[in-house]
Amino acid sequence: MSSTKWTDEQRQAIFTKNCNLLVAAGAGAGKTAVLVQRIIEKILDKEEPIDIDKLLVVTFTNAAAAEMRERIGDAISKGLDEDPESKVLRKQLTLLNKSNIMTIHSFCLQVIKNNFHTIEIDPNFRICDETEGILMKQEAIDELFDELYEIENEDFINLVESYASRKDIRLQGVVLELHRFAKSAPFSYDWLLNMAEEFNVGEEFNFEETPWADMIMEDMKVLLHGFKNMLQKSIDVILNSEGIEYYYEPFKMDLNFINSLLEKLSFKEFRGEIIAYDFPKLPLKRNKDADKEAKERVKKLRDKVKKRIIELRITLNSYENEFTKKEFIFLYPSMKALSNLVILFDKKYEAKKRERDLIDFNDIEHLCLSILTDKDSKGHIIPSDIALDYRKKFAEVLIDEYQDSNLVQEVIMSMVSRVKGYWSFYNGQLMFNEEEINLEEPHIGLDIPNRFMVGDVKQSIYRFRQAKPEIFLDKYNEYSEEEGIKNRKVKLFKNFRSREEVINGVNYLFKQIMSKTIGELDYTEEEALKVGASYGEEVKGEPIELCLMDKKYEISEEVLKEYNVDEEEALDNIQLEGRLVAKKIQKLVGNNLEGGLKVFDKKLGEYRNLQYRDIVILMRATSNWAPVFVEELAKEGIPVFADTNSGYFDTAEIKTMISLLQIIDNPLQDIPLLSVLRSPIASFNDDELIDIRMVNKNIAFYECMEIIYRLYKNEKLDSYYSFYIKDENKINKIIKDMNEKLKNKICSFIEKLKLWREKSINIDIDEFIWFLYMETGYYGYAGALQAGEQRQANLRILFQRAKQYAKTSYKGLFNFINFINKLKFSSGDMGSAKILGENENVIRIMSIHKSKGLEFPVVILSGTGKNFNMTDLNKNILFHRDLGYGPDYVDTERRIAYPSLVKNIIKNKIRLETLSEEMRILYVALTRAREKLIITGLINNMDKAVESWLNLSDDKNKVPEYAVMNGKTYLDWIGPAIIKHKDAVSFREELKMSSELSNIVDDKSKWKIELWNKKELLKEKVEEDEVEISEKIKETLMNLGESNYKEEIYKRLSFKYKYDNASSIPTKLSVSDVKKQFILDEKENTEELFKKVELRKPMFMGEKKKISPSERGTIIHLFMQHLDLKKAENKEDIKEQINRLIEREFITYEQSKVINPYKILKFCRSELGKRMINSNNINREMPFSIEIPAVEIYRELDKNIYKDEKLIIQGIIDCYFEEEEGLVLLDYKTDYVNDIEEIKNRYEIQIKYYEEALNRITGKTVKDKYLYLFSVDNYIKID
């Protein structure tokens, strides 16, 4: 029936029968089309047609289920067009509405509703709102803790003392998190108790035989492979270098030792050999012909290996059996108490839900599981009678996105599928055993396997929701591609989405970095994507672009000091990356004069110009980055929309309405009250609010308003107010003097507020909120503002939330406000209302997770230099599905706490799993692109980063696993892979590192690497403005046609003021500006002279994280200004002077840490310091101003035109002192010194103007000029 030309592999996936079939479908492989076609072939099979309601099709989302139904419906309708009399087609079309195409949760709900009587649940149950559930959980845990405190439960008290800190909230958080975590296990009580029992070890316990020991060994072997590479590399250098062959033997011994460790199978032998090995000493031979550079290089590599082996030895020493046993025994009571606490909490929470006839989202799967499972006499988990009925009913069970299944879902699907076997616990883990089970009655036909599972483990990115990619991987490794067997797999790796350039680039990168260790799968040629899409020859594909920006931007100490900014504050790095992306987009889209990228339109069947809607910017997380990118793109006139999950509660309209609700509930809250008073709802101005506060500064603001209201209305004040009013005459005078209009405003607001408070009691919260919208006119006001449609949509969401809340068991305004507060913090805020349609011509910014399943002509992946989020590893108790609990060891009696041995193991395991998840997330991001892929990222120090990348490039085929394992950003993975690619040659040459790489990879993928820096991005803005003006002039002239005035118009529009440069010359310059200008003249003339100033956020708006270079310089200069040279004979004297500055509040204690007494003492004891001490005339921090000709600074100016232009040069001379022959000028520098000549050149012009200033001011000659360099404890003379 289908006209689609299927590949051989797709046909196998569509037509293979009578087996459990696993379809591994790579990105863009058309798995949905294959799944739909398989269903169509099943229901339209001429020999054995299957009614569509006899198929269970489980999808990941409701949208996917709806799309599948629609596709199947279209196929049936098309068949009816060809054969209108077909009874089979008509029947299937009728049955389509009854089809079981749904999400796993929809199926579970169906099972519960059809079998509610078996689990004693009210048939009228309701699924509780997420936040309603949170409120009930909080109630339950508060009540539980109170009860346990009351009965003084000893285990609970010990648990509190060990893990609760000062407040219970920390332990409550642990219980709630563990409860959520346990609910993703099929039988959560069993799992909780089993995990606690892992700590219940006896005298026979032997740590060396536990799974934890094997895990330590395997993790360490990954590192050892890295050490092996380093030693092998060293041996190659030794054998190919002159005069260091005597190093060969000790290096070879080390390599043999590493190889021996890698072969060890038992932890005991592995541990013993590492602890016993003694590194041979290197021979101390001297050979004048030896290659010193090579010798030093191999020594450094060996020292690095030795250091790491010693660290491993220390770690392994800590895993001594008796010590480990004692630790387990000590932790057992706490872990058992924790498991029991979670179970008690769950029972209390369950009771609260049952009281209200509620179930929550987790209950849906667990209740279904309890209906579908039973236990046999041996305790094995087998299908219930109800499950067996489902097995009879469903001819096939088809599961989409199988890689994202969790263990609960896997057990449920195994109960309704025709699989032979049972589930049971083994060493605390639930495992499936593929064996025959004895059922009470035979079930004919149920022995034919009927599971169809499709997915791509490389796109499993939901581990944070407890997805278990191992479920897919286990089958992938066990199933065979052989025909005619019961467990079979088919691979669909032909990509019908992307251009060859995208596919080749993705394949190259992931062959280099994805492995079983990180990614949980070896990305081999067999796993690689194959080109399946055709884009014709009309437009050639483009290389993948890697745009790197160096965060390091050389700004001297003087400039930092002058503007009082930190390097990081000079311009926000996210902002700069956003600007970089904006420039790439402008180039891609093009303009009227120059065409941009052409993309193929599938609907039109031809190429067209790229539009904004064709571009997506993907980020790992959007909360902090997306708003900055939106701002930067909007500045460039690029339409953009960010699909985020945050920011809703920060919008002005929602803040105002929540504040209004808060003061209606309780007006004695100053901050929300002032927010409402200053809003258009009340329209008080600042002066009016000050007048109100003058009534009394010690009471709530509302009480001030209440006093004014009562006295103005001649009402008597009650005793409460009388207590605060000591002088009623004074208050009456304040009110009498108060503006009549203000008094009326106060009375009007108080009366309205009282009416609203009364009304809030009598109507439902959703009605009340809508009443407030209309009553205050705020809904209309919000709509009249800029982005009014968006604001009104946000207000409607608040109304909808209130409507949901009104249906819960909680009532009242107070509880609704709590509900909203819980929503803020429990759900991590929400995104603003979505008002954009699919066809809006805007750039979209979204998280990688939200992009899964989508595709775009152009993908820009940004933020690749951002660190992975590993904050969860810092919690005091870690949880792992297979390994259980990883607690801190806390001994309250001895007051000691440290990570337990098992916590360190689990921490490392979670870290590796997190990195594997990040690897797969990167894969998802890069495979969204159809035609063009751009990757952008920031790097702290480009030279250092590239040097480290080059050190990892020995293996052409793979970035070393240990390097991938130590990666902290996506660029840490991408960089080492790309630096050795043939297309990176020019990039390496630009960084003067082309000679350092011998292993160039000649891969068919195409890459374009661009290096950007901050200065370029700042400079280009001004240049673009000038080009834009020029282009507008050209456009205007073109539109004139054949006008007689064309030449005159061009002349006028192009006119430049003769003295235009003079308008840009400042009247005053600092010496630092002058110095900077002269440096620029040598490099780039005066390109920065007339540049626009980039506005930055004030310091008080940013969080101060560290003392900046400018602050450090200022602090040291301040100390040198106040240093008493006569009392600086030793370090103690200097420390005393530092403390005196702290006492006088010149500096803080934190700031004082940058002053090194030893360095100050070295200055005092230097020859220059002694000369200064011996002088009778010392002057410090002397400000000056001198006038000089402008052409002396701006040498490119026409001297005839600008000969009379003058500039004022200002500055502060650090120090000068007088000797018999003249003055000695001294300037302190705290810059890092790399090259003495460079420092001299940098500050020569500055010192020149200091000298001239001293000559003019004192009338005396400057005999010597010095820079004192604190970084190297030395001084240099300036000639």
Curated annotation (Swiss-Prot):
ATP binds at A25, G26, A27, G28, A29, G30, K31, T32. Gene3D superfamilies: 3.90.320.10, P-loop containing nucleotide triphosphate hydrolases. One of its GO terms (molecular function) is double-stranded DNA binding. It comes from the Bacteria. Its EC number is 3.1.-.-, 5.6.2.4. The heterodimer acts as both an ATP-dependent DNA helicase and an ATP-dependent, dual-direction single-stranded exonuclease. Recognizes the chi site generating a DNA molecule suitable for the initiation of homologous recombination. The AddA nuclease domain is required for chi fragment generation; this subunit has the helicase and 3' -> 5' nuclease activities. PROSITE patterns: UVRD_HELICASE_ATP_BIND, UVRD_HELICASE_CTER. Transmembrane segments: none annotated. It catalyses: Couples ATP hydrolysis with the unwinding of duplex DNA by translocating in the 3'-5' direction; ATP + H2O = ADP + phosphate + H(+). Its cofactor is Mg(2+). Keywords: ATP-binding, DNA damage, DNA repair, DNA-binding, Exonuclease, Helicase, Hydrolase, Isomerase, Nuclease, Nucleotide-binding. Belongs to the helicase family. AddA subfamily. GO terms for cellular component: cytosol; DNA helicase complex. Residues 4-499 form the UvrD-like helicase ATP-binding domain. This is ATP-dependent helicase/nuclease subunit A. Residues 526-853 form the UvrD-like helicase C-terminal domain. Heterodimer of AddA and AddB/RexB. HAMAP family: AddA. One of its GO terms (biological process) is double-strand break repair via homologous recombination. The gene is addA.
